[in-house]
C-alpha cells in the first residue's frame, strides 16, 4: 500500500488576489516509510500536510491511498476512517482535566475499542515512552517533553495507517527532539504505517528514509 500524491494544486483567493501555494506536487510514500518535508516558511509544507489529512481541499489533483482516492467528492475519507489518520502537532494540546491515561483511552473508545482494550493499549504505549508511573497525573504535572510524548502516543493510539506530523519537535531542545523523532520512526516502522513529518531541523534528517524539499510550492530536485 502507498500514499500517492498526483499533481496537487492549491490556490487561495480569486482573480487578481489569487495566490498559488502549491503548484503541481507529485510524490509517493510507501507503507512503512518515514518521509520528512522540508522547506522555507511559505513554501507550502503545512498546506500540503493539511490537504493530506483532509482538513483542507485541494484546488486540483488527487491523493490516492491503496489506489483509491483518499477523499470522496464531499471530502470524506473514502477508503479510510478518520481514525486511520493520526496527527501530531507542535503543541501537545492535552485536555487539562484528563489524567494521562485518559488522554489515550478516550481516543481509543471513541474509535470503537472497549474500555478494556483501550486501557491495555494505552498502558502499553505509555510504557514504551517510560511514563508508566505517570498514568494518573494531570498535564500540569508533566514537563514539556513528557506532554509531547503523551501527545505522540495519543496519535498512535488507534494504530492509524497514516501519521502526519507538523513540527512536533519545534519547542524541544536537541536531545529531546532526537528522542521524539526516534520514537515516531520506531512506531511507523513497527506498525508499518505511512509517516510524513515537517521539520526545519536538519539534524533530524538522518532518521528519515527520504527528505522531500519544497520551494515556492514545488518539489525541488
Curated annotation (Swiss-Prot):
Main location class: membrane
Listed InterPro entries: AAA+_ATPase (IPR003593), ABC_transporter-like_ATP-bd (IPR003439), ABC_transpr_LolD-like (IPR015854), MacB-like_ATP-bd (IPR017911), P-loop_NTPase (IPR027417)
Binding sites annotated in the UniProt record for ATP: 39-46
Topology in the lipid bilayer: Peripheral membrane protein
CDD domains for this protein: ABC_MJ0796_LolCDE_FtsE (cd03255)
Any GO molecular function: transmembrane transporter activity
Enzyme type, top EC level: translocase
Classification via PROSITE patterns: ABC_TRANSPORTER_2 (PS50893)
Single GO cellular component term: plasma membrane
Disulphides: none
Subcellular location: Cell membrane
EC number: 7.6.2.-
Key words of the record: ATP-binding, Cell membrane, Membrane, Nucleotide-binding, Translocase, Transport
Domain ABC transporter: 3-221
UniProt record similarity statement: Belongs to the ABC transporter superfamily. HrtA family.
Function, in words: Part of the ABC transporter complex hrt involved in hemin import. Responsible for energy coupling to the transport system.
Subunit structure, as described in the record: The complex is composed of two ATP-binding proteins (HrtA), two transmembrane proteins (HrtB) and a solute-binding protein.
Protein name: Putative hemin import ATP-binding protein HrtA
